[in-house]
Curated annotation (Swiss-Prot):
GO terms for biological process: succinyl-CoA metabolic process; tricarboxylic acid cycle. It comes from Burkholderia multivorans (strain ATCC 17616 / 249). This is Succinate--CoA ligase [ADP-forming] subunit beta. It comes from the Bacteria. Belongs to the succinate/malate CoA ligase beta subunit family.
Length: 388
């Protein structure tokens, strides 16, 4: 689960991390009112969407008068903000963050992530803040510094000081940087975050260290422990299909292709998408119905996929272990009839009750294209999507 920058800063503030004074605004008049309350002479008007690259897309403006605050708020609110993370369609801006201006002298980068290789938390930092860290990592990997944090001990002061020194924090500002890194780590740990990022971490001309941005991602599996985090959820920023899928315990992610995928198991789902791409197709979604799929879940999965206007074909790829093939077949038949399926459907099933499942599909009277292997299924669905 993602949250907005201003919400991330609320969390950082609770853990003692220095952030600029600011408040969210949901209208132009409210933006001006917040600016008046903060006092000038400089304010920053920032679009709030769940994507990075807002500045380059025109979603961050520096205002030097209340008239400019009004002008920029009017420009940004309601716009379709396009960044490298939103795709060409962009995301609509429904809220702003109005902040006091900052004296920017040195922009740094720090973040915390879970490293699946070491199975520990990794603190990362770079002297190249204020820009896309992916670009820095690709072109100048030597500028990315990493610290492995032992969960049993937490982030040590010596580790925080060492990283701060490596990324260029002046010696006089090291104690402030240490406090910010410790606060960031505690926020990450206590909220069950999967990512906590400050970019940029600013060192001002007088040596003050302040987090000018905040980005958090949270482990959705741990949200039951954090109602205060769930309260930050903004459904307007999420894919409606993914929201609908969560109601039926379906793991669904929308993609840009035209071939729908219905699979049981995340690993098989990813392998299925890879195989489709291998044969020249493009998956329209990731959809894992899980090991306990019911007829209702399969029917809802079909409904979700068919809401995509660009859908050209569907591939159902099932390995029947815990999940029985006859149950999937029943769901495929019911789902196809319930939604009046009007795109080609390729089905490949292997495992428990495989023969029964295939017979049910054959006897259904539906124009289902059968396949015995994943490669054959992928080739057939790619051809069907192309109208061949």
């Amino acid at each position: 689960m993602k949250i907005h920058e201003y919400q991330g800063k609320e969390i950082l503030r609770k853990f003692g991390v220095a952030v600029p004074r600011g408040k969210p605004a949901f209208s132009v008049d409210e933006a001006v009112k917040v600016a008046e309350e903060l006092g000038g002479p400089v304010w920053v008007v920032k679009a709030q969407i769940h994507a990075g690259g807002r500045g380059k897309g025109g979603g961050v403006k520096v205002a030097k008068s209340l008239e400019q605050v009004r002008e920029y708020a009017n420009q940004i609110l309601g716009m379709q903000l396009v960044t490298h993370q939103t795709g060409p369609e962009g995301q609509k801006v429904n809220r702003l963050l109005i902040e006091e201006g900052a004296d920017i002298k040195q922009e740094l980068y720090v973040s915390l992530v879970v490293d699946r290789i070491s199975q520990k938390i990794v603190l990362m930092g770079s002297s190249e803040g204020g820009m896309d860290i992916e670009e820095v990592a690709e072109k100048h990997p030597e500028l990315i510094h990493k610290v492995i944090v032992e969960p049993s001990t937490g982030l040590l002061d010596s580790q925080a000081d060492d990283l701060a020194t490596k990324i260029g924090v002046p010696a006089a500002s090291i104690p402030q940087a240490r406090a910010i890194l410790q606060g960031l780590y505690k926020a990450f740990w206590e909220t069950d975050a999967s990512l906590a990022e400050i970019n940029p971490l600013n060192v001002s001309g007088d040596g003050k260290v302040v987090a000018l941005d905040a980005k958090f991602n949270f482990d959705s599996n741990a949200l039951f422990r954090h109602p205060e985090i769930v309260a930050y959820r903004d459904l307007d920023e999420e894919d409606p299909a993914e929201i609908e899928a969560s109601k039926f315990d379906l793991a669904y992610i929308s993609l840009d292709g035209n071939i729908g995928c219905l699979v049981n198991g995340a690993g098989l789902a990813m392998a299925t998408m890879d195989t489709i791409k291998l044969f020249g197709g493009e998956p329209a979604n990731f959809l894992d119905v899980g090991g306990g799929a019911t007829t209702e879940k399969v029917t809802e999965a079909f409904k979700l996929m068919l809401k995509n206007p660009g859908l050209k074909a569907i591939l159902v790829n099932i390995f029947g272990g815990i999940m029985r093939c006859d149950v999937i077949a029943e769901g495929v038949i019911a789902g196809s009839k319930a939604v009046n399926l009007n795109v080609p459907l390729v089905v490949r099933m292997k495992g428990t009750n495989e023969d029964l499942g295939k017979k049910m599909l054959a006897d259904s009277g539906l124009p289902i294209i059968s396949a015995d292997s994943m490669e054959e299924a992928a080739q057939k669905v790619v051809a069907a999507a192309a109208g061949k």
